[in-house]
Amino acid sequence: MLYRKANECTLAAAGLTVRRECSQKYILMSERNVLYYIFSVVRLLLYPFALIYGAIVWLRNRLYDAGVSSSVEFIVPVISVGNLSVGGTGKTPHIEYLIRLLQYQFKVATMSRGYKRRTQGFILADETANALRIGDEPMQYYMKYPEVVVSVSEERMTGIPRLLQSAPDVDVILLDDAYQHRSVKPGLNILITDYQKPFYSDYILPYGRLREGRSAYKRADLIIVSKCPPAMSPEKAEQMKTSINPLAHQQVFFSGIDYDQPYDLFTKELVILREKNVVLVCCIARPEPLVHYLRDMAKDVHVLSYPDHHYFLSKDMEEIKETYENWNIGNKVVVTTEKDATRLHLQHKKLRSWGVPIIVLPINVRILFNQDQQFNDTILKYVDQAASEHREHTLY
């Protein structure tokens, strides 16, 4: 997107004829139209590849549905949390919601792929764990919930037996981002879809962002529309529910994000961001809601955005330092997310030497429209019943 005022040559190159006295706003709109046209053409060229990819995924699912490819069902309660699309739908805070709901009644374990970790195979998190070893999201679980058994494994089917062998007292396993891992049949399948880009209005890769076709939603037991705006109306929720078209056995819920109390990365002391000037360092798929929140909360915000799950290199650290030091303003801090903090912490010696305040902003999930009790009861009922059967089985 170009924000400078274009001249006639620039417009001619874009195939537009506009008088020199036209407004900058009109030029910006014209440039947007050109970019949208280019994007549409490129996307259209990707459509044949989407058909091929979609056919492969469809065949894979049919093989599982027909029993040709086998799925393993474990006696221990297994809850899968995943999505149909690539990118951030908010799986991590929903996993944390389930941890907080279950951890005081049951021994909880999580199993993630450990995306972008520098290791392979099954790993049980211990005191040697860091984001490089187990991935940023599992490291976040490990740091926040010491009573939870945190594990990573690319292959859930072989990883779960190893997890249970290492921690036989586990009552329930939460599978992170496992909706497409059909080699394991979960007892409860939770599908999360983003409010801004629900699966029913999206298309399969690479034409759209779906990992598999829209009809795959039928495998879910619970469907959560995530990142809903605080002022979302019941009418809008009902409209989206109609578009989802849930099956008889499916329940649909809506969730929003609540930002929790910020704290210092090293001292863990609580911090108030109001009236502070913020350098936001984030590596998340959709940072816009976070930026919007900070612009409302803080005095001013400077954004440094990196790719999702990005590991900070020396040049990135220098960019953060220079941005902070060169911002000629007082009462300033660096703010990051909990997930990004696990990777920033790998550079803790350098960060401490700077003397720059690094503030972590946690987020929590909230179930909307007073449906939290219904959601909680559904989860607890399944786990309680399945865990009881698991305990009875282990006695014999």
Enumerate the predicted regions with their spans:
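ATP-dependent carboxylate-amine ligase
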Residues: 24, 30-36, 184-191, 195-396
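A transmembrane-helix-recognition feature enriched in membrane-embedded lipid enzymes
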Residues: 29-74, 371, 382, 390, ...
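Residue-level signal for inorganic ion chemistry
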Residues: 52, 92, 141, 176, ...
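Walker A (P-loop) phosphate-binding motif
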Residues: 62-127, 230, 396
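Phosphate/Mg2+-binding loops and adjacent switch elements
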Residues: 114-248
